Structures are given as C-alpha cells and as structure tokens.
C-alpha cells in the first residue's frame, strides 16, 4: 500500500511538472524598464552616420504608372534590403498596382521571419497605420495610393526624417556621383567616397562622373604620371574638406579582397597608365593596394576618418580581420568598420579592443539580423568602451530611413534593458550609452558636425559642452 501511495505521489509530481514545464522567457520589451529606455532613446536627435539619400528630384526606384513615374509600395521594397535577399516581383512596365499586387502578394510568405522584411513593418505601422503582416488587397491599394501622393513633393520626406525619425544630421555617401559634395537637405552632410579613386590606374577604368582625370582637367590639372594622379587626389581631398565633408568611405569589399599589401610606390608607378587591355589582374591589385595605403595616410593628414565596408557582400574576402596589418601600421588614422563586420561581429570587437583608432558602426546590422545586432551591442559593450560605437540607417527613401532608425532604437533599447535587468548595468548608464551610440559618439569623432547642428536647443547644448 505504501509503495502504491509513493508511486501515486511520484506520478502526480510528474504531471504537475509536465503541466507547468519551464517558464517561458519574459520579453523585456513588455516591461516598464524597456519602455523607459526606449522613450529616452526616441527623444535623442540622432546622428545617422550613413545614408544614400539623393536630391528629391533624383529619387531612385520610381515605377511607371498611369500618373507617370511614381514612388510606389513596390518602390519601398525595391529600395530596401528586402529585394536583395527575398523574392520580389518586378513592376511590369506600364502595369497597374493591382496587376503587380496579384503577382507580388505571395512574395512575402517565406520572408515573414527575416529581419530584412520585419524592419520595414514599423514604417507601415507608424507612418500609415497599416499592419503589413495581415494586409488585404484593398488595404494594399490604399497604402500604395498614399505613398504615391506623399512623394509629389519633398515635404513628406523631410518631415519623416526630421520629425518622425528624429534625425538631426545624416552623412550621405553619394555613390552615384562620388566627387560632388553638394548638400541636398538641411540635415545632409557630405562624405568623400574614395572607392573609384583607388581603381584609377588608367582613365578608361573610371566613369567620367567619378574620374580624378576628368575632375583634374576641369581645373587645368593634367595627369600623365602617378605623381600627377596623386596631386589631383590631394586636391580632391582638399575640396572635400572645404565643402565640409567629414569622412571617407570605401566599398571596395564588394569588388575585391580587403587584404591590402603595402606595395612600394615604384611598383605602382610602373603599373600606372597601362590600359585595361594591358594591365594584369595582379598588377591592378598592386595599384589598388598602394592606393588604399596612400588614401589611409591621407585620411590622417586631412583628419577625415575612414569608413570601410566590411562583411556582408563579397564574403570570401571581406572579413575585417584582413585589415589588421593596415590598421596596426596606421595608428594616426581613425578607422570605422561598417556593418559591425557582419557576420564577424566578434572579430570586429576584438580588433576594436586592441586598437584604439578603430570604431564600430552598426549600420545595416539590425536590418540583416535583429538578433545578431542585439547580441553584438551587448558583446561590444563588454569588450570595448562605449564611446566607439555608432549607427546608421543606410537606405534611400523616407520609409526605409524611418524603419531602419526605429528598429535600431528598439534593438539598442532591448540590448541595454536586458543588461540592466540582469544587474550588469545601471539604468542611468544605459541611457547615457544609448545617447552616445545614437548621437554623441558621432559628434565626438566628426567635430565639424557640431557647427552644422540646426536644432537650436541641441546646438546650444553641444556648444556649451565644447567650452
């Protein structure tokens, strides 16, 4: 009898344990702690360190509609990272929205969990009041009509960037015209993209719009030798500084390996001037290696920190670890490793830990993988000082900018709230760190930004802090 009673008690215990099971992990986003941190970060007028926002009259991804070229719902996805990872039906030439939606409405089913899809949802939710996960054909048509109407002039774009996304300044990389430094908006700050400069072993290598040869000839500077070429490049740097450009940007990781050898000047001079038909791939790489080291030294000379695309793209040659020799040999140059080196976020942190002239920019990371971005923020803060981490949205229109900004603020707030909840950080320090990443670190790294601030209360506050 006693044995049967013990068995019964044991069985009941198993039932109770099975019924209760392990408690599900609490979602920090449902807590007052997260709400306080998120509200604090939302109030920070952000400095966005990387955008590709064109002048309004040159907006990309417009579709042919019965009302003429227009920004459409398709345009929003086509101008985002969604289309590079997931299926997106093309907009048929001259088609109506209904024709496109009939083909495209099923495109999103296999992407529902991807960050490249989910990061856009806050834009539809907050700017248009639409739950895109459950959108109907009628709602999609209405959403499309509202998007088309919003882009009849630039008022919507400016309002979303400055008020809804709460961005005060953004650094604009004009990859469509790398040697122009015009400011299309009050909030835009020019960047000198040096990607094509480093390829210019011969004038036929470059499009006219990006050519130091064409730029020099317009200023009576002829290029016959490597010395001539470098003299024009130095003038371009000086022009960028005069136009208030605050940094350099390289996207060579899309084209080639990030391993740059310290090639002697003489070897580059021997290669210079060879036509594309004559030069070998090895010789072209030697020239680019020399130029990358030269541009790195110019970065220090002109006090233009160097943003370098690392990670996602041409993965077989884009690990930030390949830059270590260059970084170590150039301690006066301030390097900014873009995208956190995704997927090598840990390696990127190790580089920054060992080299105080390295900053990490989380630009793009939350839209590639929200979970990895949250983990990266927490790991980076454990490995390196909080004053060398930044962020950027890296998009091309209002909805993408808002979405990337909102998801970054949320991801950062979640990462910080979890650390506070675990007792690893005081809430007051979490708020300060959040502001550093969203704003203060960029102002410290790019000091010229302080005189470009246009919100009077923040400009006054920063001026007072500088005195």
Indicate residue ranges for each PLM-predicted region.
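Sec/Tat signal peptide C-region and signal peptidase I cleavage site
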Residues: 21-25
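A contiguous, mid-domain pocket- or channel-lining segment that forms the substrate-recognition surface
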Residues: 159, 165-221
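Active-site beta-loop-alpha junctions enriched in small/polar residues
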Residues: 52, 175, 193-199, 251-255, ...
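Mid-to-C-terminal alpha-helical segments outside catalytic/metal-binding sites
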Residues: 28-47, 56, 61, 70-127, ...
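Histidine/acidic residue-rich metal-binding segments in metalloenzymes
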Residues: 156-161, 224-250, 257-358, 372-390, ...
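Alpha-helical scaffold segments that flank or form the walls of functional sites
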Residues: 42, 63-185, 226-244
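Divalent metal-coordination and catalytic microenvironments
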Residues: 50, 170, 248, 309, ...
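Bacterial N-terminal signal peptides
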Residues: 6-19
């Amino acid at each position: 009898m006693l044995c049967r009673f013990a068995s019964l008690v044991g069985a009941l215990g198993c039932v109770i344990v099975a019924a209760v099971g392990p408690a599900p992990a609490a979602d920090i986003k449902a807590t007052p702690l997260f709400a306080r941190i998120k509200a604090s970060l939302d109030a920070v007028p952000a400095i966005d360190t990387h955008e590709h926002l064109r002048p309004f009259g040159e907006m990309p991804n417009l579709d042919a509609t019965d009302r003429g070229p227009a920004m459409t719902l398709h345009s929003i996805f086509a101008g985002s990272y969604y289309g590079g990872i997931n299926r997106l039906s093309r907009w048929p030439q001259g088609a109506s929205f209904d024709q496109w939606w009939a083909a495209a409405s099923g495109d999103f089913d296999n992407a529902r969990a991807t960050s490249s899809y989910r990061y856009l949802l806050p834009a539809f939710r907050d700017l248009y009041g639409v739950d895109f996960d459950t959108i109907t054909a009628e709602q999609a048509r209405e959403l499309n009509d509202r998007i088309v109407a919003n882009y009849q002039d630039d008022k919507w774009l400016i309002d979303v960037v400055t008020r809804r996304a709460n961005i005060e300044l953004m650094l604009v990389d004009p990859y469509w015209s790398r040697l122009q430094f015009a400011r299309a908006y009050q909030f835009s700050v020019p960047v000198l993209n040096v990607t094509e400069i480093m390829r210019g072993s011969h004038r036929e290598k470059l499009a006219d719009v990006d050519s130091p040869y064409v730029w020099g000839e317009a200023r009576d500077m002829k290029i016959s030798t490597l010395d001539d070429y470098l003299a024009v490049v130095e003038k371009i740097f000086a022009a960028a500084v005069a136009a208030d450009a605050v940094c350099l940007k390289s996207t060579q990781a899309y084209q080639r390996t990030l391993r740059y050898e310290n090639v002697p000047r003489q070897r580059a001079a021997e290669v210079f001037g060879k036509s594309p038909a004559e030069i070998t791939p090895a010789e072209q790489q030697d020239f680019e290696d020399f130029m990358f080291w030269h541009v790195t030294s110019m970065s220090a000379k002109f006090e233009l920190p160097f943003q370098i695309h690392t990670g996602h793209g041409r993965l077989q040659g884009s690990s930030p670890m390949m830059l270590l020799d260059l970084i170590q040999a150039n301690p006066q140059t301030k390097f900014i490793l873009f995208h956190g080196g995704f997927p090598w976020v840990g390696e990127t942190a190790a580089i920054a830990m060992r080299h105080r002239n390295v900053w990490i920019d989380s630009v793009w990371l939350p839209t590639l993988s929200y979970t990895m971005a949250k983990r990266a923020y927490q790991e980076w803060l454990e490995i390196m000082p909080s004053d060398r981490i930044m962020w950027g949205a890296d998009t091309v229109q209002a909805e993408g900018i808002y979405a990337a900004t909102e998801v970054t603020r949320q991801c950062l707030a979640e990462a910080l709230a979890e650390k506070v909840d675990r007792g690893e950080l005081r809430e007051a320090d979490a708020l300060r760190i959040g502001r550093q990443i969203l704003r203060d670190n960029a102002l410290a790294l790019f000091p010229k930004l302080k005189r470009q601030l246009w919100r009077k209360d923040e400009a006054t506050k920063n001026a007072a802090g500088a005195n």
